[in-house]
Amino acid sequence: MTVNGIKQMKGYANLTNDYMFKRVFGSEECKDILIAFLNRIVGNGDIEDVTFQNTEHLGPTADDRRAVYDIAVRTKSGEEYIIEMQLAQQEYFRDRSLFYASYPILNQAALAKEEFRKAHGDAGVFRWNFRLKPVRFIAVVNFPMTHGSGWDESRYFSSYRLKEDESGELLHDKLQFIFLELARFDKKEDELETYCDKWMYLFKNMSHFRERPKVFDEKEFDRLFEIAELCNFTSDEYYNYQNSQKMIYDYENTIDFAKKQGEAKGREEGLAEGLEKGLERGRIEIARNMLKAAISVEQISLLTGLSEEQVQSLVDEANV
């Protein structure tokens, strides 16, 4: 689309779009948006600045699995934040969250040693007292996570820490997992009560806005609405956004078709697993199309919910 065509566009971008999510929350130009979001979601309100960190962490050996985050930042006080947008449901997403959070924990020994050498040079023997800085993992997920039988189905926010089983005593406050479940959020504009409500509403509905709703007239949303307004995009930005958006549409359409196929198969065969088989076939077909578009194995895994090993097997199959 031409620049003039973009300038005539009305409305705002989809914040769950991979390109847009990383641009809004993972770029230096929009750092103030990320800080406002973190202060509202974590609730302490004391984050003044962050520095962006490497989003790819390699395992100890070449054969070990690596971790690739959407966004990683460190605050002035040394707290580490990992922020993820997950559209596709994954069976072991909680496990992956824990795996991801382990890297910044392990890296703190190296950081402590680096600080020691800056202060003392090569003199002295480095010893670390194991004092950790907090690590917080925040995930916005587009599916309902599994909870216990007493869980309120409308509760979209969950926060987990390490606690003693019987008393609930906190082991320490250095590891926290926060999950925001878009599938459980169904509040209307006039029902928004908290800033967390407002952020969830934006994730689900911003692409449907034609103008900025009055409920978002606070100053902290100014930059977000400026960046997300389609008429402010350059040609390259719009191209990248649309490419990422097409992946979402393709995924949703294929999964919807796969569900129908699976339901039909289940009715025909009387098998409860018919739906799941159809979904799995849909994910595999999406992955094959993404591979043809030269999308990375890691990105395909994140978007489809297939493991990297499953996607790699499709690569090997195509190369035979």
Pin down the residues of each PLM region:
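Elongated, amphipathic alpha-helical interaction scaffolds
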Residues: 1-320
